[in-house]
Amino acid sequence: MTTEIMQISLSHNPADARWGEKALISTNDQGVTIHLTSHDQLGGIQRAARKIDGQGIKQVKLAGEGWGLEQSWAFWQGFRGPKGQRSVVWAELPANEKTELEQRLQIIDWVRDTINAPAEDLGPEQLAKNAIDLLCAVSCDAVSYRITKGEDLREQNYAGIYTVGRGSDRAPVLLALDYNPTGNPDAPVMACLVGKGITFDSGGYSLKQSAFMDSMKSDMGGAATLTGALALAAARGLKERVKLYLCCADNMVSGNAFKLGDIIRYRNGKTVEIMNTDAEGRLVLADGLIDASEQNAPLIIDAATLTGAAKTALGNDYHALFSFDDELAQALLNSAHSEHELFWRLPLAEFHRSQLPSNFAELNNVAGGAYSAGASTAAAFLSHFVKNYQQGWLHIDCSATYRKSAVDQWSAGATGLGVRTVANLLLAQAKQ
């Protein structure tokens, strides 16, 4: 690996034919040139950064014209990797763009590092504490919080989080964090964010195969994404009150673990029969959504690495969006477009809510065998725990959170996608 700083420049001219047809990068005695086309320039920069990193170049300087905020960020998205050290000398930016870049580097890199962390190093309580630390680093005066842990969850009737997490030696945790920059303890809550924080998912007694378990340190991606989104919105100047609920647990196999056929009784009166212990994310989110509904906020967003079905539909490039509220769903898609992130809305209809039949409880935690729309029925399950589910509620199935292997735009591991979109939406809603 070279220790010299390599200059990286942008060009709208094609590379010399010696570099091959439509070559993305070329080199000369001045450094590396990225050759942009009129189509998907940010994606081209990100792919070029992956190529540069793959050549062992770890210290670079962004030189010449064209390096604005989004170009610089696209380079970092591709250049960054989960191991080894990299450094970038950034091009000069206007003060506001420099500040935004620094905020993204602090917050979205935190999200990626947190999702990439080994499960042994990041249990439920540590995830909650790390989330508090991030938000305190951004706006500590506006932050207060409560951690409910272990047997206290059972006593306070957080039945989903407690049931899922009781099989682990590491106690389950609910973090309820209040971001209130108004200084008024009676200020209305503009939004509630509810994140799935399963710090390792073995599948429980519905045990995963190794090929599906090896990435399950990342099953807390929804919690990390929403924590980062609130932090970025706060850094960008959010002045409205937002509550964050992180539903954190390990899903393990033990003599104390929950079993197929068990019935969970929730605080809102719903009963749920367990027919698959690997459909645990929705069980912990239900507790957070009940709390969120009690705040009477006009906006509730939950995010979770919830289903393989969403990845089957969209791959790892798009996050899946579900909502009964067309106007709100479009607002999030508009925010995603503004932030150069990819979301795709998938179906969620009233009839999906009846596709979770149980012989012994009001709901089953998985859809009946005749109903194969797994991502839609998972979203429908969650809707039973949102008081006003038809308006003001968004569910994000985080299919783009993590990649098991590198591709042309991304290294292996966490992407940080979704943080900017949710932050943008929070700020847009605050202006209404």
UniProtKB/Swiss-Prot annotation:
Pfam families: DUF3663, Peptidase_M17. Its cofactor is Mn(2+). The keyword Metal-binding applies. It catalyses: Release of an N-terminal amino acid, Xaa, from a peptide or arylamide. Xaa is preferably Glu or Asp but may be other amino acids, including Leu, Met, His, Cys and Gln. Binds 2 manganese ions per subunit. Keywords: Aminopeptidase, Cytoplasm, Hydrolase, Manganese, Metal-binding, Protease. GO terms for cellular component: cytoplasm. It is an enzyme of class 3 (hydrolase). It comes from the Bacteria. GO terms for molecular function: manganese ion binding; metalloaminopeptidase activity. It is found in: Cytoplasm. GO terms for biological process: proteolysis. PROSITE patterns: CYTOSOL_AP. Mn(2+) 2 binds at residues 196, 201, 219, 280. The active site is at residues 208, 282. Its EC number is 3.4.11.23. Transmembrane segments: none annotated. Mn(2+) 1 binds at residues 201, 278, 280. Belongs to the peptidase M17 family. Probably plays an important role in intracellular peptide degradation. Homohexamer. This is Peptidase B. It comes from Yersinia pseudotuberculosis serotype IB (strain PB1/+). The gene is pepB.
